[in-house]
Amino acid sequence: CMTICTMEYWPVCGSDGKTYPNKCHLTSTACTSQKDITVLHEGKC
């Protein structure tokens, strides 16, 4: 999981109920935690 994410703030709501600063951060977290986290919708949860 060598993903480098920008600090751009385009929040997305993950299927784990958490708001991520952008889709890259969600994808990176899913990879490092070995969980299947998907984007439920754009914006905060």
UniProtKB/Swiss-Prot annotation:
Kazal-like domain residues: 1-45
Disulfide bond positions: C1-C31, C5-C24, C13-C45
A Pfam family hit: Kazal_2
Chief location category: secreted
Compartments (UniProt record): Secreted
MF terms (GO), sorted A to Z: ion channel regulator activity; serine-type endopeptidase inhibitor activity; toxin activity
GO CC entries: extracellular region
Keyword list, A-Z: Disulfide bond, Ion channel impairing toxin, Neurotoxin, Protease inhibitor, Secreted, Serine protease inhibitor, Toxin
Site-annotated residues for Reactive bond: M7, E8
UniProt entry tagged with the keyword Glycoprotein: no
Tissue expression per record: Expressed by the venom duct.
Domain remark in the UniProt entry: The cysteine framework is IX (C-C-C-C-C-C).
Family label: Belongs to the conopeptide P-like superfamily.
Function: Acts as a neurotoxin by inhibiting an ion channel. May also act as a serine protease inhibitor, since it possess the kazal serine protease inhibitor signature.
Stated name of the protein: Turripeptide OL11-like
Source organism (scientific name): Lophiotoma albina (Sea snail)
